């Protein structure tokens, strides 16, 4: 793969439009896996996705030009899945399984175009929403976040000269390589790139992926970015996300259906993927509530991804549950992925080494760590915590509780209703940086 001079590309503002999102496969792999399930089981469900800036001190609408944002969003609406991409999706093996995507699904996907968006400003923030059929709207999530984040980066660097930019990227590369050197000290490490949604830029994410591929070799297990996996001959990694139980819960008509929502989506997932990709994401309505009510068969799944509790605390809770269920944690897998920096990866690895199989999904602190790289402080280079979540399903409010109350989403009255229903045990606030 040809290496780009990132500083030169940033400095050269001559192009009419430098697309941030170059392909609909410039997304997380689990979006495609979930999309197939949505297409198959929920074809008539309407949803609303909403942009949520959790770093409220940052006024995104003051940093990003609205015309540039609209141009990038409009460009995404022109994209489809190319013939080359369809051939790769149909013929490649994922997690050791061929034809994971059904031919009928790929035929439908070949004609997809993303629906319209709604954009306005309020109090220094953009109000960005996507409405429509779930199976047509869900692919907006990752491009929308990547666009917002890269436009912030571009705006922050726009006034700088080439040599200043060259120094910034040289320092960022050196900082990244220092992380690689530290990770090389962990025998048996398994780590992958989860950094698409909050990356500094597409080119920078690609550089980071190539650096990990060369720097830590087999310890680098792949990337969640489908396009980069295809172009770099890497494993595409990922399973499922919170939107599945969130929608299932929103659609529930009875308390029994609400209680069963987190487990029903797992059963449907297991059926669709024939016993593969069996990783549980337990925290949509609180991990303790999930483990308390989980059917015994959940303990037979391959592993868990604790996503919003501190990694050591969350991992210990799941290990204790496995032991209670009579399972050997050494045969199970924990995937840690919540806001990890190198120190957290090393501490977590050393804490659990020999007790459980581990893998790490490295996100924002891999693909958007420019703190200390500029000659002076540039606020726009500091990553923010921004998400794009389902807020409605068939006109009914959707909720995510999380193990961290600061990550909860939904209308306050609905959040309170869910808390009364599922309980608030072991939910603890801790700062959300990314």
Swiss-Prot record:
Residues where Phosphohistidine is found: 242
Pfam families xref list: NAPRTase, NAPRTase_N
Principal EC category: ligase
Gene Ontology MF, one: nicotinate phosphoribosyltransferase activity
PTM entry text: Transiently phosphorylated on a His residue during the reaction cycle. Phosphorylation strongly increases the affinity for substrates and increases the rate of nicotinate D-ribonucleotide production. Dephosphorylation regenerates the low-affinity form of the enzyme, leading to product release.
Alphabetized UniProt keyword annotations: Ligase, Phosphoprotein, Pyridine nucleotide biosynthesis
Catalyzed reactions: nicotinate + 5-phospho-alpha-D-ribose 1-diphosphate + ATP + H2O = nicotinate beta-D-ribonucleotide + ADP + phosphate + diphosphate
Gene3D superfamilies on file: nicotinate phosphoribosyltransferase
GO biological process: NAD biosynthetic process via the salvage pathway
GO cellular component terms, semicolon-separated: cytosol
EC number: 6.3.4.21
Pathway(s) annotated for this protein in UniProt: Cofactor biosynthesis; NAD(+) biosynthesis; nicotinate D-ribonucleotide from nicotinate: step 1/1
Name of protein: Nicotinate phosphoribosyltransferase
Native source organism of the sequence: Allorhizobium ampelinum (strain ATCC BAA-846 / DSM 112012 / S4)
Phylogenetic placement of the source organism: Bacteria, Pseudomonadati, Pseudomonadota, Alphaproteobacteria, Hyphomicrobiales
